[in-house]
């Protein structure tokens, strides 16, 4: 099976063309391939499938390193767009794809960055899903023997965002796994730790559901900005600094889609016998 290794700001992926190849991945196989000592090593596996709708170009599937399938990955979406162009699967600059959670439009910019229309952030608890009586800008939760304040949103996948004074010293390793599997998130959650530098600049670390802390999380950056705008602490255009680099997020508010722009890097092509 042929594959490519790619990354978006250090969030790394194994990308597989299932348009021209017949492939099947069991959770056990994914876990073996994700192992950085015994396999390829990656945060997520991305699979390019033929479209299910004639109006679309491809279907986009995402699997975490633990073998679980998820509905969204923003950094992966940028790598997906770069991959299908590099492999000659399309020559379009605007690529329309379906995911488990809906549809996305991926646009290649003139300077070879990828702009992703991530759709409109969803703050409705039942659709995140998050156990709450009603939608709030800020929720109080008990975790790791303390009370934390957070915003909760879906970007096609669930996110919990905490504002911290200093992202370098944030309790990512202790609070991250506790909140990820908190009972109020029936499908678990990605946990973002956001430091607001000013209204157009934040620093962010993300503990990803099923993957742990990663170098960058695209949907997490989108979620942090959406929550920051909802809480009136951020402007419409924000630079997000992650451990692996920077993304640019733009959102005009409710009723509008959110856009994420950033790089996608091809590392190497490989072949593995399964």
Curated annotation (Swiss-Prot):
InterPro entries tied to this protein: DAP_epimerase_AS (IPR018510), DAP_epimerase_DapF (IPR001653)
Task of the protein: Catalyzes the stereoinversion of LL-2,6-diaminopimelate (L,L-DAP) to meso-diaminopimelate (meso-DAP), a precursor of L-lysine and an essential component of the bacterial peptidoglycan.
Statement: the UniProt record of this protein carries the keyword Secreted: no
Any one cellular-component term (Gene Ontology): cytosol
Important for dimerization, annotated site positions: 268
Naturally occurring in which organism (per UniProt): Erwinia tasmaniensis (strain DSM 17950 / CFBP 7177 / CIP 109463 / NCPPB 4357 / Et1/99)
Catalytic residues as annotated in Swiss-Prot or TrEMBL: 73, 217
Enzyme Commission (EC) number: 5.1.1.7
Highest classification ranks of the organism: Bacteria, Pseudomonadati, Pseudomonadota, Gammaproteobacteria, Enterobacterales
Entry keyword annotation includes Amino-acid biosynthesis: yes
Keyword annotations from UniProtKB, A to Z: Amino-acid biosynthesis, Cytoplasm, Isomerase, Lysine biosynthesis
GO MF entry, a single one: diaminopimelate epimerase activity
Family to which this protein belongs: Belongs to the diaminopimelate epimerase family.
UniProt-annotated binding residues for substrate: 11, 44, 64, 74-75, 157, 190, 208-209, 218-219
UniProt xrefs under Pfam families: DAP_epimerase
Catalytic activity, reaction form: (2S,6S)-2,6-diaminopimelate = meso-2,6-diaminopimelate
Gene Ontology biological process terms from the UniProt entry: lysine biosynthetic process via diaminopimelate
Disulfide bonds: none
Locations listed in the record: Cytoplasm
Residue(s) at site: Could be important to modulate the pK values of the two catalytic cysteine residues: 159, 208
Pathway participation: Amino-acid biosynthesis; L-lysine biosynthesis via DAP pathway; DL-2,6-diaminopimelate from LL-2,6-diaminopimelate: step 1/1
Assembly with partners or alone: Homodimer.
HAMAP family per UniProt: DAP_epimerase
Main location: cytoplasm
Protein name, as recorded: Diaminopimelate epimerase
């Amino acid at each position: 099976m042929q594959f490519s290794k790619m990354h978006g700001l250090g969030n790394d992926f194994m990308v597989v063309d299932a348009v021209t190849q017949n492939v099947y991945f069991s959770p056990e196989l994914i876990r073996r391939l994700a192992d950085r000592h015994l396999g390829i090593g990656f945060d997520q596996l991305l699979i390019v499938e033929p479209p299910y709708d004639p109006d679309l170009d491809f279907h986009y599937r995402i699997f975490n390193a633990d073998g679980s399938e998820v509905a969204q990955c923003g950094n992966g979406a940028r790598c997906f767009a770069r991959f299908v162009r590099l492999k000659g699967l399309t020559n379009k600059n605007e690529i329309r794809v379906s995911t488990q959670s809906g549809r996305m439009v991926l646009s290649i910019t003139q300077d070879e960055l990828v702009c992703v229309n991530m759709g409109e952030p969803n703050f409705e608890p039942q659709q995140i899903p998050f156990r709450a009586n009603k939608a709030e800008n800020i929720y109080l939760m008990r975790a790791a023997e303390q009370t934390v304040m957070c915003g909760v949103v879906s970007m096609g996948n669930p996110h919990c965002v905490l504002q911290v004074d200093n992202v370098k010293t944030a309790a990512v390793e202790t609070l991250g796994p506790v909140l990820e599997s908190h009972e109020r998130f029936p499908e678990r959650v990605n946990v973002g730790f956001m430091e607001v530098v000013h209204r157009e600049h934040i620093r962010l670390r993300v503990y990803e559901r099923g993957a742990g802390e990663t170098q960058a999380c695209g949907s997490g950056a989108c979620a942090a900005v959406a929550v920051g705008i909802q809480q009136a602490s951020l402007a419409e255009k924000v630079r997000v600094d992650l451990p692996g680099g920077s993304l640019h997020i733009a959102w005009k508010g409710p009723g509008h889609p959110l856009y994420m722009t950033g790089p996608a890097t091809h590392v190497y092509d490989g072949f593995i016998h399964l």
